[in-house]
Amino acid sequence: KQRLANLEEANAVLEARAQERYEAEKAAYEAKQREREEKTRKPRGRKPKPPEAGPRDKDQYNFTDPDSRIMKNSNNSGFDQHYNVQVAVDQESLLIVAPSLSNHPNDKKEAEPTLDALSPKVGKPKAAALDNGYFSEANIAALEKRCIDPYIATGREPHHKIWRTYFKQLPDQPPEEASPKVKMAYKLQTEIGKAIYRLRKCTVEPVIGIIKEVLGFRQFSLRSLLAASGEWCLVCLAFNLKRMHTLYQAKGLL
């Protein structure tokens, strides 16, 4: 009976996840359609296919830790059972000011929860730089609503730029009716946009690297979303204590 009850629970969870995925894919599909319609030239490539509702053959349920999800591993060599961790990092001190954790594979949903995790005691950031995995109109609106100037990449940057890109002139400012994606792409090409976004690479990425390589944290010991969230907060606290020791030492206070 218990096995049957577990299977029924798993089926209900898969149905709920499928509906959540369908709604997210539908919103993304509608956004792509709007973007195609806004273009003055005839769009290239095939029209995006509308999403299909319901569970898929490859959908899985983990009985050991039902809260975790199948996600791409860090080196993109396959898929594992994971949680999605996030940190907001202060650019000047390199201290973690907001940790968050979820079971959403897509980072687009993670900007707002991380912003919500920011305590008023640490102050309000003037600007925020995020990579292209976070780009969405909703995230731009969420940052602007909090009076935070957003700088979100609209696409992947090539690792090795050709020399012509360094001498490329700034294009004309897009019209007011241009899409948020076009406006953001222009914003990131301005001098201030390039300067702020450049700082992201030496702010968040070193923190994640230190957590993995120096603190040695690469997997969770606890199960469930709540327990894993607590464990992630402890890891971020450990990083901050280590970082504060370095900062105090540099000022001759230790």
Whereabouts are the PLM-identified features?
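Anion-binding and metal-coordination hotspots
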Residues: 1-254
